[in-house]
Each structure stands twice: as C-alpha cells, then as structure tokens.
C-alpha cells in the first residue's frame, strides 16, 4: 500500500493530483501525478505518472501470480493510463537491493512432461507432451471479464536483485542467483506472457536433481546466460556450473596413482545446460584443478564415452568416488 498527505484538486469533471509525494509501506518516497476525467463518474479515463526512487514497485505472492511473484524494489518511471475497457501499464525501472523475484513457467500438474533428465519411454513422453496442448502460460488470462489489462515492463536488471528461475517445481530443480541485463516483459489479461532480452548470471547456484535421488547445488560460472525470445518456455539457456569435491583417483585405476602426487585429488564435476528451457540438452565433464595435463589426459582415456562420463558423474555425486570398471580399464590399459 501507499500513503500520501497532499492536496487533491476536484472539479465537476476531473480529479487531479499534482506531483505529490507518496510513501510505500517501507517509508520509501516517490512522486505521483494523476488526472482522472469523468462524466458524473461515468465514461471515465485516467492518466497516472509515477517517479520512484528505490520504491516497492511490485509485490505479488505465488497465489496472485504463479508465473512471476516476489517483491521488486526499483527506481524509474511508470505510466498507467486507461478507461473502463482498457488499462495500459508502461514501466521503465532499474532493480534495487532487497528485490527477490521468482519465475515459474512450468505447470506443476504437468512439469514431469518437460523433465529433461529422465529415463522413460520416448513415445510415451511425446504423447504426454502432445496431450498438454493447452499452453500453461494461459493462466495469466483465465477470464475476459472486466477491463483488459496490458502491461509492458522495461527492466534494467542489476546484481542487487535475487532471481530464482524454477526449472522443475516437482523435482526442485532451480537456478538461483544474481544477474545483470535488460529484460522486456509483456503480458495481460487477454494475452500470453512474452519476454525478451539477455540475462547474464553473475553468480548463483543450480540446484540439480537426478531422478529425485541426487540433489546437489552446482555453482554457476560467470558468463552463463539466459536469452528470452518471446515465449518464456523457449528461453535459450547456456549454463556452465561446477560441483567441487575430492576423490581417490586410484578408484578409477591404480595406474593413475603413478602420475598423481597424492591419492585424493580435487575434482570439478561440470554440468553444461544448453537449449530451450522447455527441453534443454545436458552434458557433463570433469576437471582436475591442481593436477597436471598428463594426468588429465590419462583419465580421459578411461572416460572416453558419454555414457562412461555420466556414470562417473553419478558415482562422484552419490558416493564421492570414481566408478571402477575392470573390463573397461583393462581394455584401456592395453590400448595405452
């Protein structure tokens, strides 16, 4: 809520507020001008201009708006104009500290249909996806009753804001962190949500789950990006994240101990996430900080297929150790 103490100018056909000072519930100040024209308070139209400085500009819980919820403190301008049939919001803001926003574009009732890390029958998965022809984002405009609302947000996102992108509300996969970039958000009571712009993740974590057995927080590397091109479901992600641990290199093969100065070595489990939010591709890799190039070359000789890399990642994340395959290591040793 907002409060003000100032003069209201009234006449027979209009109500006016002229550059008054308003205060949000946290005591932050802004300036508002309003012109409300009417004919006996019917056939009305209005124009509101807002100049805010670190003010509470958005505050919605998940029930009010399940797609975009949280609190936004921002500085900038907003214009609201309309009548009894149509109301337009044009907002140009820069995020400020204490902003915490949640983006959830997955339908909780059908989130598993878009689970991109799962072991299921592909034909069954395709049938399930086809059966969800009703776009989950239509929740924005469930009714056509009342005045139509059209909203256009131009946002300058700064690292002050905490942003959480929910990938899978059932499994708990989510990207949480701080970002920078420019973002345009358009939606209304009779139109689908559209988003445009590039967001660069400055720091954050990817809460990764696999079959709801593994739950690990991967640290997102600087330079990871999310590009919005309209439909949020088709946002393009390029995420690189790591999970640090220490493991016994001898569990992979005893011969590797000859190249390593110690038994337990630092290991980075690397997760690469690329593609559309709806169904990104995921791949894994391993890095060995503080180890020499020859040791890494020898390790990659044992782990030379995608299946073996995935198996090693699962073992490292679940058991904190390398997977040992005697037949496989024997063949690899013979080749070397």
Annotate each language-model stretch with its function.
Residues 328-335:
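Conserved small/polar residues in nucleotide/adenosyl-binding loops
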Residues 1-324, 336:
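Strand-loop-strand
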């Amino acid at each position: 809520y907002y409060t003000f103490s100032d003069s209201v100018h009234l006449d027979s056909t209009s109500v006016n507020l002229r550059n008054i000072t308003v205060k949000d519930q946290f005591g932050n100040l802004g300036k508002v001008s309003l012109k409300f024209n009417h004919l006996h308070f019917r056939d009305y139209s209005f124009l509101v201009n807002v100049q805010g400085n670190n003010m509470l500009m958005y505050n919605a819980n998940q029930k009010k708006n399940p797609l975009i919820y949280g609190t936004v403190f921002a500085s900038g301008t907003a214009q609201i104009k309309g009548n009894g049939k149509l109301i337009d919001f044009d907002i140009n803001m820069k995020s400020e500290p204490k902003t915490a926003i949640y983006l959830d574009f997955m339908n909780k009732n059908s989130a598993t249909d878009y689970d991109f890390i799962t072991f299921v029958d592909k034909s069954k998965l395709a049938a399930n996806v086809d059966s969800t022809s009703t776009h989950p984002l239509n929740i924005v405009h469930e009714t056509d009753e009342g005045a139509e609302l059209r909203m256009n947000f131009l946002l300058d996102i700064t690292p002050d804001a905490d942003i959480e992108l929910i990938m899978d509300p059932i499994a708990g996969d989510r990207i949480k962190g701080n970002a920078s970039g420019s973002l345009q958000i358009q939606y209304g009571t009779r139109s689908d949500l559209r988003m445009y712009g590039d967001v660069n993740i400055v720091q954050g974590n990817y809460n990764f789950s696999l079959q709801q057995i593994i739950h690990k927080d991967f640290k997102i590397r600087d330079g990871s990006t999310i590009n919005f091109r309209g439909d949020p479901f088709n946002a393009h992600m390029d995420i690189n994240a790591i999970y640090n641990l220490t493991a016994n290199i001898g569990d992979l093969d005893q011969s590797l101990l000859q190249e390593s100065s110690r038994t337990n070595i630092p290991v980075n489990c690397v997760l690469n996430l690329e593609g559309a939010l709806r169904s990104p591709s995921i791949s894994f890799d391993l890095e060995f900080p503080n180890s020499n190039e020859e040791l890494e070359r020898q390790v990659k000789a044992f782990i030379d297929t995608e299946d073996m890399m995935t198996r090693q990642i699962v073992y490292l994340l679940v058991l904190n150790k390398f997977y040992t395959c005697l037949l496989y290591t024997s063949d690899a040793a013979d080749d070397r």
